[in-house]
């Protein structure tokens, strides 16, 4: 049964008891839940041990004359739905509990004006300061490992990511794709204000964005042409009054003029009134190639499959294992005790790692601080140290940032245990490659026999693999999990070639879509 807390003291006491040793996810909402919120909650429940749903209609983000008083509220319905989805806790504080003064006399978080004074912020002064203030309070109160936000509120998402970066907050921000009705209308609590006729009229927003997306896919990079394509569709529905239509950099929200950049994702954002209801929508125009994320337990054949998929598609194999080996080598080279985590963090935080892709069957080359260590990272001493280093939070944070940097341009295939859930949660194609414990043990036994080692017991191998699975799936940092949107491939009765071909066909199917 879902627990409901109205006070900070009650929630924090519960989290200290029930959340000890568990991953905590936060889904901040203003209530009146719809399918878009449902997608956030489902993903959070799938990925986190304990999920907190906050319901708070934030007065700080409503301006004079906006719909604060009539904003839809349905706490009983929200509670029932949250419980059915497996949410552990609802935090529904009062204005007083969150320290909001009627006179506005409270500490306020002020994100960069360049991000808050464009798009919606240009028409809703103070809105994003109100959002940032309450979200920061929620992060401080709940201390979540991951917070989930919808991509529909793209400006809010970009500002919160910047807030987390600038304030050195430890929470990970995870975005989830916009959920739409069959008509294409983006899910919103305000959709219930619309009459049936207005709801039909509102579908023009997404159709207009799709028109620009089509031009973009055809190679048009001129801002004026893309805006014209959108406006032509909007003009066919004169009852919809556009407040703004703009192309901005997706991360910084800076307006773009002239020609779109090829490197960075671009946000096409729109706000319009349908009757008296204000709606927003957006699409990201991204020139990068897709990313394939392959996860799975040890012994499932991920490394071999991933490399062959990359070769077969002409993509880059992102050897994340080589990155961890590189840092393990650096720690050994500098004489740092592996168990001295502060010293490890100090050393590795400033390390420069560069991968040097090589054609199969050569292993990936690596430079550390400009030094080629491609052979040095393959020694037994480094191999023995890798798992110890990989379990440290500072090391994982360092390499997570580096891996995502490689992913900025796309066109990569990466494998691991948390690639689709942690490193590239928005990868276009996610694969969970697995096999039974018995099958993986048989494969391992064949490897040992091929090396001339005949004194290996199959039953012991099975026990070792099962134990490794348990450790990987229950570790505190980035546990092995199947992403909710991953395609599972069980390889017990498949050859490597068959698995590779299956993944390549899935990739081609995605590209056609």
UniProtKB/Swiss-Prot annotation:
ATP binds at residues 30-37, 150-153, 179, 187-190. Transmembrane segments: none annotated. It comes from Synechocystis sp. (strain ATCC 27184 / PCC 6803 / Kazusa). Residues 1-283 are annotated as: Pantoate--beta-alanine ligase. This is Bifunctional pantoate ligase/cytidylate kinase. Residues 284-513 are annotated as: Cytidylate kinase. The keyword Kinase applies. Pathway: Cofactor biosynthesis; (R)-pantothenate biosynthesis; (R)-pantothenate from (R)-pantoate and beta-alanine: step 1/1.
């Amino acid at each position: 049964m879902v627990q409901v807390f109205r006070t900070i003291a009650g929630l924090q006491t519960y989290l200290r008891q029930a959340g000890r040793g568990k991953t905590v996810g936060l889904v901040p909402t203003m209530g009146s839940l719809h399918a878009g919120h449902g997608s956030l909650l489902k993903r959070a429940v799938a990925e986190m041990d304990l999920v907190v749903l906050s319901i708070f209609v934030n007065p700080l983000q409503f301006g004079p004359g906006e719909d604060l008083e009539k904003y839809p509220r349905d706490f009983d319905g929200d509670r029932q739905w949250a419980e059915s989805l497996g949410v552990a806790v609802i935090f529904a504080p009062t204005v007083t509990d969150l320290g909001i003064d009627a006179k506005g006399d409270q500490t306020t978080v002020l994100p960069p004006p360049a991000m808050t004074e464009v798009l919606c912020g240009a028409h809703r002064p103070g809105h994003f300061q109100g959002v940032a203030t309450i979200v920061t309070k929620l992060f401080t109160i709940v201390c979540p490992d991951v917070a989930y936000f919808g991509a529909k509120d793209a400006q809010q998402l970009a500002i919160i990511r910047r807030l987390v970066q600038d304030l050195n907050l430890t929470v990970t921000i995870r975005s989830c794709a916009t959920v739409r009705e069959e008509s294409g209308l983006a899910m919103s609590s305000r959709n219930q204000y619309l009459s049936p006729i207005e709801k039909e009229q509102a579908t023009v927003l997404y159709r207009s964005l799709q028109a620009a997306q089509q031009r973009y896919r055809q190679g048009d990079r001129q801002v004026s042409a893309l805006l014209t394509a959108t406006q032509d569709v909007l003009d066919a529905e004169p009852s919809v009054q556009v407040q703004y239509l703009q192309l901005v950099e997706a991360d910084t929200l800076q307006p773009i003029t002239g020609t779109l950049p090829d490197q960075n994702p671009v946000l096409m954002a729109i706000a319009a009134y349908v009757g008296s209801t204000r709606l927003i929508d957006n699409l990201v125009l991204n020139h990068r190639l897709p990313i394939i994320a392959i996860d799975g337990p040890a012994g499932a054949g991920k490394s071999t499959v991933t490399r062959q998929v990359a070769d077969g598609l002409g993509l880059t194999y992102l050897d994340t294992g080589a990155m961890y080996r590189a840092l393990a080598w650096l720690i050994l080279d500098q004489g740092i005790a592996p168990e001295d985590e502060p010293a490890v963090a100090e050393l590795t935080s400033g390390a420069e790692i560069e991968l040097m892709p090589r054609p199969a069957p050569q292993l990936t080359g690596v430079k550390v601080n400009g030094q080629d260590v491609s052979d040095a990272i393959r020694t037994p001493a480094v191999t023995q140290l890798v798992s110890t280093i990989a379990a440290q939070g500072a090391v994982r944070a360092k390499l997570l940032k580096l891996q995502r940097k490689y992913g900025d341009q796309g066109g990569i295939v990466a494998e691991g245990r948390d690639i689709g859930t942690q490193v590239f949660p928005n990868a276009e194609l996610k694969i969970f490659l697995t096999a039974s414990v018995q099958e993986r043990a048989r494969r391992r036994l064949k490897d040992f026999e091929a090396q001339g080692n005949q004194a290996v017991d199959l039953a012991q191998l099975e026990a070792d693999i099962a134990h490794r699975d348990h450790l990987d799936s229950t570790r505190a940092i980035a546990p092995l999990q199947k992403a909710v949107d991953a395609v599972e491939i069980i390889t017990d009765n498949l050859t490597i070639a068959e698995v590779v071909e299956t993944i390549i066909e899935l990739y081609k199917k995605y590209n056609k879509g």
